[in-house]
């Protein structure tokens, strides 16, 4: 805070000649007027005004007495501190890192729980438990189904424009909710009323039928792709999942999203509605009807997490080297294998 103080300094003229021009110069005599306080002035003075700016600091100084050099050094210290503080550039507060912190905490919790479960029992027992629970089947099917899927490219396109952690959180929230809903629908097949119950495992047969249907359909669609579809996913964007994802993102995200909540909501809504009725959802329903709901839900969510993470980190890179035809054939074969395994009770 700077305070301007005007100080008037009167500089007298050295001499004044007589009017007739003769004789030595007359000395000026001061006349003092007393009006409450003494105010002296000299006649025929020319006032010269100067503005003196005094720099003050808004530092609170406690009461105390200073003598001699202590007072001077204290004043110099305050002046130098104020100067240094005023010369330092002010930095705006950094943005919050809550989404990254939440993702890191969830990842650490998952790793800690996996570590405890794995080392508490024998590794072979853990693997057998995962296989029997449906975790392995759900993870493999969902992971292969999501690679090159519409939701895969939606997450990749959004991650190119916005913060990756926010896109991952929004996408995984949608996929986790969709997985839970699918498992609940699958368990409804097991809750048949008593008057309709028979000795036939209707839920398992429905799951086998769904898995076989998607297996044959995936192989048929991949086989009908043109020969130039062997190149990569991005090269076939005119008629593939990438073209649909690009059109959907351009239509729904017309303006730039600035708020983190907007990015979370847009990622959630786009992925949720794109996943509704998709083959991965129906595959989760089929597995949920035939196997353990907890194993299927955890395996499906883990498969979604790995596939979505790959899409966000290197979706554009993977699209250059993955063949749409090859991905479709592998997915169809896996669907058929799990249908056969479910029929013979392997899982």
Swiss-Prot record:
<feature type="transmembrane region" description="Helical">
    <location>
        <begin position="327"/>
        <end position="347"/>
    </location>
</feature>
<dbReference type="GO" id="GO:0071421">
    <property type="term" value="P:manganese ion transmembrane transport"/>
</dbReference>
<feature type="transmembrane region" description="Helical">
    <location>
        <begin position="165"/>
        <end position="185"/>
    </location>
</feature>
<feature type="transmembrane region" description="Helical">
    <location>
        <begin position="299"/>
        <end position="319"/>
    </location>
</feature>
<dbReference type="GO" id="GO:0015085">
    <property type="term" value="F:calcium ion transmembrane transporter activity"/>
</dbReference>
<dbReference type="GO" id="GO:0005794">
    <property type="term" value="C:Golgi apparatus"/>
</dbReference>
<feature type="transmembrane region" description="Helical">
    <location>
        <begin position="196"/>
        <end position="216"/>
    </location>
</feature>
<protein>
    <recommendedName>
        <fullName>GDT1-like protein 2, chloroplastic</fullName>
    </recommendedName>
</protein>
<dbReference type="InterPro" id="IPR049555">
    <property type="entry name" value="GDT1-like_CS"/>
</dbReference>
<keyword id="KW-0150">Chloroplast</keyword>
<dbReference type="InterPro" id="IPR001727">
    <property type="entry name" value="GDT1-like"/>
</dbReference>
<dbReference type="GO" id="GO:0009507">
    <property type="term" value="C:chloroplast"/>
</dbReference>
<comment type="similarity">
    <text>Belongs to the GDT1 family.</text>
</comment>
<dbReference type="GO" id="GO:0005384">
    <property type="term" value="F:manganese ion transmembrane transporter activity"/>
</dbReference>
<feature type="transmembrane region" description="Helical">
    <location>
        <begin position="99"/>
        <end position="119"/>
    </location>
</feature>
<dbReference type="GO" id="GO:0032468">
    <property type="term" value="P:Golgi calcium ion homeostasis"/>
</dbReference>
<dbReference type="GO" id="GO:0070588">
    <property type="term" value="P:calcium ion transmembrane transport"/>
</dbReference>
<keyword id="KW-0472">Membrane</keyword>
<feature type="region of interest" description="Disordered">
    <location>
        <begin position="70"/>
        <end position="97"/>
    </location>
</feature>
<keyword id="KW-1133">Transmembrane helix</keyword>
<feature type="transmembrane region" description="Helical">
    <location>
        <begin position="257"/>
        <end position="277"/>
    </location>
</feature>
<dbReference type="GO" id="GO:0019722">
    <property type="term" value="P:calcium-mediated signaling"/>
</dbReference>
<keyword id="KW-0934">Plastid</keyword>
<dbReference type="GO" id="GO:0031969">
    <property type="term" value="C:chloroplast membrane"/>
</dbReference>
<keyword id="KW-0812">Transmembrane</keyword>
<feature type="transmembrane region" description="Helical">
    <location>
        <begin position="124"/>
        <end position="144"/>
    </location>
</feature>
<dbReference type="GO" id="GO:0032472">
    <property type="term" value="P:Golgi calcium ion transport"/>
</dbReference>
<keyword id="KW-0809">Transit peptide</keyword>
<feature type="transit peptide" description="Chloroplast">
    <location>
        <begin position="1"/>
        <end position="12"/>
    </location>
</feature>
<dbReference type="Pfam" id="PF01169">
    <property type="entry name" value="GDT1"/>
</dbReference>
